[in-house]
Amino acid sequence: MKRAVVVFSGGQDSTTCLIQALSQYDEVHCVTFDYGQRHRAEIDVARKLAMQLGARAHKVIDAGLLNALAVSSLTRDNITFPGYEDSAGGLPSTFVPGRNILFLTLAAIYAYQVEASAVITGVCETDFSGYPDCRDNFIKALNAAVNLGMARELSFVTPLMWLDKAETWALADYYHQLDRVRHDTLTCYNGIKGDGCGQCAACHLRTHGLAAYRAQPQAVMASLKAKTGLH
């Protein structure tokens, strides 16, 4: 039996990864991390989506220590979220140092216990917003380290790594789930489900990606298929 663990926040990217994983694996588990994020609604959104989409299990893991160690606008009310115009150059205030190092390592431990062969994460280098822990070389390096430390072959799978946001929307549409991803996920830094606030950097990427897909759906879908091998 092919099993996978999806690092699941309830946002656009991880939900799209979950949708695809459910079509590719016999059993899919979700792990969501409670790290003291400002908008707790994302945990509730993740719970609901995991159940609705049919994940075998959904585990919420306490990662509160990250909040104590890493200062970020995602965890501190007194730090302002960046707008899109503020996101160019340098690390944005939304960067949480060590977040993906911790999340992927904990997800790998869970995968070890349930005998999963893959940990799936929605990180993307094309739209990575300056986060160093979303880069392909980082994911591969951590994957190698985890495999050495656990003496077991586990794959860190990144379906969105080389896709832009338009192609990520196309991927959701490929599985006939675009409307669910649009209306039921929470990506907005200001904690607004669906189309979000429209002002933060996350909403800008999401909104402009959807507009780009809708403007040229056939071309974007063809690009997606060329990159991923989907038919």
Curated annotation (Swiss-Prot):
CDD domains (alphabetical): QueC-like (cd01995)
Keyword Nuclease carried by entry: no
InterPro entries: QueC (IPR018317), Rossmann-like_a/b/a_fold (IPR014729)
Annotated ATP binding sites: F8, S9, G10, G11, Q12, D13, S14, T15, T16, C17, L18
EC top class named in words: ligase
GO biological process, one term: queuosine biosynthetic process
EC number: 6.3.4.20
Residues of the signal peptide: none
Catalytic activity annotation: 7-carboxy-7-deazaguanine + NH4(+) + ATP = 7-cyano-7-deazaguanine + ADP + phosphate + H2O + H(+)
Cofactor, how bound (note): Binds 1 zinc ion per subunit.
Annotated positions binding Zn(2+): C188, C197, C200, C203
Pathway(s) annotated for this protein in UniProt: Purine metabolism; 7-cyano-7-deazaguanine biosynthesis
UniProtKB keywords: ATP-binding, Ligase, Metal-binding, Nucleotide-binding, Queuosine biosynthesis, Zinc
Molecular function (Gene Ontology), one example: ligase activity, forming carbon-nitrogen bonds
Xref: Pfam families: QueC
Keyword Nucleotide-binding: yes
Cofactor: Zn(2+)
Function: Catalyzes the ATP-dependent conversion of 7-carboxy-7-deazaguanine (CDG) to 7-cyano-7-deazaguanine (preQ(0)).
Record-linked PANTHER family: 7-CYANO-7-DEAZAGUANINE SYNTHASE
Family, per entry: Belongs to the QueC family.
Protein name: 7-cyano-7-deazaguanine synthase
Gene coding for it: queC
